[in-house]
Amino acid sequence: MLIDLTHLNDATFFDCIEASSKPVIVSHDGVQAVCPSECNLSDDRLRAIGKNGGVVGMEIVKTELVRGSQETGELVTFDNVIDHIDHIVEVAGIDHVGLGLDYDNFPLVRNVHRAMCPFPGSIEGFYTGIPKGDHMTEDPNDISEGYVIAEYLVNRGYSDNDILKILGGNLMRVLEETIG
């Protein structure tokens, strides 16, 4: 079983870490040290994930990346995402960070949801009704260019091996250790 600790309070989060004999994940989150938000992870939580062998999936929801971006309309960039990744690496280690974009507006996902629920507008209102600009990047309406995260990681000095870990290698390790 793979345990996801996203959206848990401190007591439950640390109880789950203590009870788990396998690595856990936080499927999508940012870090408080870069953007103070109750939803983001404290350094204590990051250290616990690192000690457990788990992985934090870095999200791209702008209100969790840059403080005040929702109110100011400021566009969040890939540099902001990498700031969070840098901090996770600094506190938990390179083996404990990945991508967990928390973004379901990809065309394939939209089409699957539409096929599952034939009622007009029902999917748009829930899955794709996020206001434009509520997610991140230079073009807030299109994250399909997400592969450029690798270019930003290169520019920050990450090695090819470390980039492969961030882009999926770390999560694959945890999946192999938990669900085989």
Identify the residue ranges that each predicted region occupies.
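Active-site capping/gating regions of soluble enzymes
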Residues: 59-100, 104-107
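Conserved, mostly hydrophobic/aromatic
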Residues: 3, 28, 56, 102, ...
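Short, electropositive alpha-helical surface patch
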Residues: 17-23, 27, 76-90, 113-127, ...
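Short acidic/histidine-rich active-site segments
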Residues: 60, 92-117, 121-139
